[in-house]
Amino acid sequence: MSQVYRVDITALCQYNQALLKTAIAPVSLDPPFFYHNGTTAMLYGGLGFLFARCLFFALDVVAQIADATNRNTPVADESGHLEKAVRCQQPEVDQETLYPFLPALEVAHAAYKKALNGSQDARLKGMEQYSGEQVFFLTMCHTLCEEDGRGSAWSPACNAAAREFEPFAKAFGCESGSSMNPKKKCNFF
């Protein structure tokens, strides 16, 4: 049986502001981020989502630095933290849990759909009951999986981002108003 550990995103990718470059650790080229014979959904739900998270994490750091130095930057809002830019008027939603996961999900999913260019993704052998879209979300959630200390795996960040993302509800047929498809949703873009 495999072990589940929480992954610190800062250990997987780094953004160098001086060089304007993002570096991703070689370990990211293994599951759950990258599957050598995976589908397009697995590529974008894994490595694509990781890269998008890295970029949004870096943007928030840049916004905080800009705020601290009182410079104007196109990514800084009045507080300097992009997590506040997640448009969410729901008091029960922890906006800190949504950032950078919700904007990264929005970007990775848009890239996935663009890569498909209107075609259907391949079905996974042994998991034919899942559409490519569902595999995208399953892979994304797998990258966020952590152990709760009692031996159970869970993903609060996955749940927080997925419940606010309409394509997730559509892919899994979540009933409107249910816990994974609230009528009012938060968004970044």
Where would I find each of the regions flagged by the language model?
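Zinc-dependent metallohydrolase catalytic domains
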Residues: 1-51, 55-189
